[in-house]
Structures are given as C-alpha cells and as structure tokens.
Amino acid sequence: IEDRPGLLALKIDPDTHQPVPYVVPGGRFNEMYGWDSYFIGLGLIAHDQYELARGMLENMAYQIRHYGRMLNANRSYYLSRSQPPFYTPYLRAILDAYGDRVPLAWIREHLGIAIDEYENVWMNPQTHLTNTGLSRYYGEGKGRPKETEPGHFDFELKKYADRHGLDVREFERRYDSGEIVEPELDNWFVHDRSMRESGLDTTTRFDGVCASLACVDLNSILYRVETDLAALTDLYMAGEFTWRGASYPSGHWRAQAEKRRQLMKTFLWNEADGTWYDWNIDTQRQQPFVSASNLMPLWAGAATPEEARRAVASQLPQLLKSGGIASTGPIDKHNQPGPERQWDAPYGWAPHQIMIWEGLRRYGYDAQAQQAAFAWLRMLVRAAIEYNGLITEKFNVEKQSHKVDAEYGNVGARFEYVPAGGFGWTNTSFLLGLGYLSDAQKAELDALAG
C-alpha cells in the first residue's frame, strides 16, 4: 500500500509510476493549495530545491490539464473554483532559475497550459471576464461551500431563519435540501465562493460583493501573466508560438497587457486618491477601500512612475505597521456581522509582504521596501524565539503577535500543533526578506536570536 499513490496524489511520474511530490502549506492544510504553491515554490527556488520546485509546477499543470483550472486545493469540493492565477509567474520564476536544465519541449508544453488557463478560466465571458474588459473572481457552484466548519455562516443564515420562523439548523437543513428557495441567499453565497477563489477568505472588502468586482489584485496578476507570456515567447520561442492551431506571438501578449493597463487606468485608477480601487460592475462605480492589493500594480509592473509615486504616498502609510504590511486599512467593526475577518487589519500575511516588497523595489522605493521587510522579519524572529520556534500563517502586525482573534484561528499557533516545518509562504517570506535588509539589520536579527 505504501508504494501506491495516495488519495491526494496528482501527477504520476511516467518513468517511476510514483506521484510527483509537492509541498503543502503546513499545519492542518495537508493538500496542495493554489496560490500558496506559488509562494512556497519561490522559497524552494531560493533554497535551490530544483526537483521540488519543478514538481510544484508539474502538479499545477496536472490540475489545469485534467480539471480545467488550478484548484483552490486538490479536494473534490474545490473543483468549482480556482485561486489567484500564479501559474504563469511561477513558470517564469522556474525558467529564470533553471531554464538551462529543462528541454524546449517541456517549456512549450507549459506555455500552452498557461494559455489554456488564461483563456478558459480568466478570460471566459461566461464566468470571469466582465463587460469592462477586466476580469473578476467567480466561484461556481451553489449554496454553502462544503469545506466550511459547522456554524460558520450562522450570522448570515439567522436573518433568513427568522424570516421563516425557524431555528438556524432547521432553516439550514431545508435550504440545503432545496425545500426552501432563497435567491437572495443563493447570490450571497456566489459572492462568498468568489471571495474564497480570491484567496482572501474572508475580508470585509469582498463581503457580499466579490463577484461584482473587477479587482485590482486579479487584474494586476493577469497583467503580469500577459507580460510574462510575452517575455517567455521572445526568450524561448523566437517571438512566435502556436498552440492548438492558434498563433500567439509575443506581440499579442504585449498588446493584451497594454489593453489591460489602459482599462485599469480607466476603471480602477482614482485620480483624487492617487490609487487603484475595485470597480463594481453592478453599480458602475469604484469601491473605495484601502487594501494591500491596491499596491499590486507595482508588483505587476502595471503602474506608471507617477502612479507608483502617488500610490506609495497614499497607501503605504495606511498599511505599514510596526510588524509589517496589514491586509487592509482600519476597519470599522462596530456593525460588522460575524467574527473578525482574518484578511482585514490588523492582520498581515506573507504573500502581501512579498509582493509589496518586490513592487516597491521595482519602482525604486528601496528604503520603503527595506523598512517593510525588516518590520516583518523582526516580528517573525521575536515570535519564533518567544514561542518555541513558532511560525504561523498570519500575524497581528499592529501588536507584532501571532495571537489572532479572528475566524479560523491561526494555523500553527496551538503549541501541540506547532508545525515542525513552519508555514510554507511565511518561510518563503523570511528567506526572500533577508535580501532586502542591510548588514546592520541582519546583525540586529542575529542579536535577537541570541
């Protein structure tokens, strides 16, 4: 039995007939997650773990090839939604590091798979492409997401239960069976599923509205996808690439990227506030919301120098705390239903740190990138020293603490479950963050560690 693939195996090596290994986030997450895999993979590359880093991409490709998308995670109840599309940026990261170690046929295959994901998922007008020409997150399926814990949605279900004169559990049973039909609640769950596809589950920014938003973060990633495809086509395919009978020259991708950049300027850029905001396709208005995602156009290279200057000036002071970048600006929690949202302030997560550091450096804001990286790494070192090597999935960046009073708790924070390997993308953030620090700052971290 031990020699046979397990239930969570994905790609099988045709030579060894064994599963191609992948790295899971850690803690209770023992399957392969979509955008976690990109950031874990960056850490593997930084640590020169070629086989594992390549294996991560092979398993991503397997999912796109067989399930039509890179899944939220490889469980059957995630088949109806993806996560942020980092397959192409990860392919480029692999090739930037190891392009001389893989055959051209392998590159050709993965370029084609990248195109399949881009066209069939993110540019699909039936689901993700909006009438603005920009894309949105859209979780398919109906009703409550199956992976959520019992009682997770009670705060929302209660108002419908009261309307029907039922307790929450009985209403839930009748709604799930189809005995009670509530189109308004169905629509609310579409937004909830879409929020989970965004990876930011959950945040006030997307609550009850996610599927209506052409998002800053998603369109920044897709701009990066388009520019990466242009660069890879030039570098490895002499500017011309044919896939499934269609031609995709590098110029096609540059034109797509420029079109998206102009659409982002038209719909997402707010001249008065000097930043980008999500666009609501139903209200035909921007949704002003201070978020770490507002700085993602810098990571993608989609900002002009002047846009970058204004966005850094307007957003960074509201996001940078003593422990790093918060997910959002301050949230008014007085009238907020349900528990605290883990992707709201005061909580900060590794992927936002990594992308914002990279974006700041790309546009010449080295001092700000260094300041943000040092704040985050100093907090990680203190937490590890004070709590038995603790490295968790998220932190309270205002209190510089792993203690999180929000939905889902904090994976890795209970001592009996402290993951021996830390937590995937947080580990990567430490490795990459060191590259932003001065020698004096590194010495300070060493002194903290004793």
Task: List each model region and its residues.
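Extended, well-ordered alpha-helical scaffold segments
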Residues: 49-60, 101-122, 225, 238-264, ...
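Acidic/aromatic-lined carbohydrate-recognition and catalytic surfaces
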Residues: 89-141
